[in-house]
Regions:
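Alpha-helical repeat scaffolds
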Residues: 40-48, 73-86, 110-125, 146-162, ...
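Extracytoplasmic/periplasmic C-terminal soluble domains
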Residues: 138-211
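Generic helix N-cap/helix-start motif at coil->alpha-helix transitions
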Residues: 17-27, 52-61, 90-99, 125-137, ...
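Acidic, Ser/Thr-rich low-complexity segments on the non-lumenal side of membrane proteins
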Residues: 41-73
Length: 211
């Protein structure tokens, strides 16, 4: 057999080994996650096999996901800070981290963590996510009216609202902006719209939790 072909086959075989091991590790992780066995998950992610086959961000993110499932606020905070302080991330990974925990900190009104996440996302190319986070932060946390003109204009556009699944949440944000402006009647009008339009959508529980 041609020597180069042999080398290519060996390289291909070696290359598949980490993939096979990674699949087995992830299968074990899912089983442990289903059983809420955090200690075993931590031990699994700390093994040499996991360190070799699973990239650093993925290992830490899987551990964070376990804490999120258990709603362990203290460990969530510790793990988020650990990832942000010590784990190199690309733009996609930064966005994934922010999406996972941002609304948790909004619910807690944890301004310092929200600011950290905003600063992190500002260094990515995910401008839509940054705008969304900044809009929520300014409206719900800072009590601002920065996005008043933009939201009012968007929600007055019938075609825009009809084809936009985010409409209920935008209505909710505008209701809060009116409240921040001291316009209680308009605030109530848009709050009722948001509650009605969010029924049966992913935003229903989110709006009620932040209401």
């Amino acid at each position: 057999m041609n020597a180069m072909l042999i080398v290519a086959i060996v390289i291909a075989i070696i290359g598949t080994i980490p993939v096979i091991i990674r699949k087995k590790l992830l299968k074990n992780y899912l089983t442990l996650l289903q059983n809420n066995d955090i200690k075993a998950i931590k031990d699994l992610m700390a093994t040499q096999l996991a360190k070799i086959c699973i990239p650093p961000f993925s290992r830490e993110y899987l551990l964070l996901n376990a804490y999120l499932k258990l709603k362990d606020d203290k460990q969530i905070d510790t793990q988020v800070n650990n990832i942000m302080d010590h784990v190199p991330m690309n733009s996609k990974q930064k966005s994934a981290l922010a999406k996972s925990v941002f609304y948790i900190y909004v619910d807690k009104k944890n301004a310092s963590m929200i600011d950290r996440l905003l600063e992190m996302v500002s260094t990515t190319n995910d401008h839509a996510l940054y705008r969304q986070m900044d809009m929520v932060n300014d409206t719900l946390i800072s009590g601002g009216i920065k996005y008043y003109d933009e939201l009012k204009s968007d929600l007055e556009d019938v075609e825009y609202t009809k084809n936009n699944e985010d409409t209920p949440y935008l209505e909710f944000l505008l209701s809060i902006i009116y409240k921040n402006m001291g316009n209680e009647s308009k605030s109530k009008e848009y709050k009722n719209k948001a509650l009605e339009d969010s029924k049966g959508t992913v935003y229903e529980s989110l709006i009620k939790s932040q209401n």
